[in-house]
Design a protein with these regions (language model features):
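Residues at alpha-helix caps and immediate loop-helix transition turns in enzyme cores, especially N-
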Residues: 16, 48-49
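Acidic, metal-coordinating catalytic cores used for nucleic-acid/nucleotide bond scission
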Residues: 40-48
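STAS-like cytosolic regulatory interaction modules
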Residues: 1-35, 42, 54-116
């Protein structure tokens, strides 16, 4: 089990996600299931969940992700935020390759517009 609060204090930012990903990857590399204990974590964003956790839906596929990952001790806000991220990841995974390329192009253009 990975006690998330041993590595980060919030589940909020890209930095939080970047700090947790190597811990998750190490667990996956041992072919173990990933149990993430969020006790003590109070702040959550979909940005965090997208980049730290539900990205594995895209690499493993929804069924394998469901077998491998378990999140425990999430607050109600944390659970709702995670479920939103998970739903989006599952929907994105189901897109055909052509639709996925179009979505990636739209996202890229939107990011460029927002950053300039």
């Amino acid at each position: 089990m990975i006690k998330v609060s041993n590595y980060i204090q919030t589940a909020f930012s890209m930095e939080d996600a970047a700090a947790l990903v190597p811990i998750i990857d190490a667990k996956l590399n041992t072919n173990s299931n990933v149990v993430l204990d969020f006790s003590g974590i109070k702040f959550f964003t979909t940005l965090f969940f997208n980049n730290a956790i539900t990205k594995y839906v895209l690499s493993l596929g929804p069924e394998e992700y469901k077998k491998k990952f378990k999140l425990i001790n999430l607050s109600e806000v944390g659970r709702t935020t995670y479920e939103h991220s998970l739903t989006n990841a599952n929907s994105y995974y189901e897109l055909s390759d052509d639709k996925r390329k179009i979505e990636e192009m739209i996202i890229s253009e939107t990011l460029e517009d927002n950053l300039n």
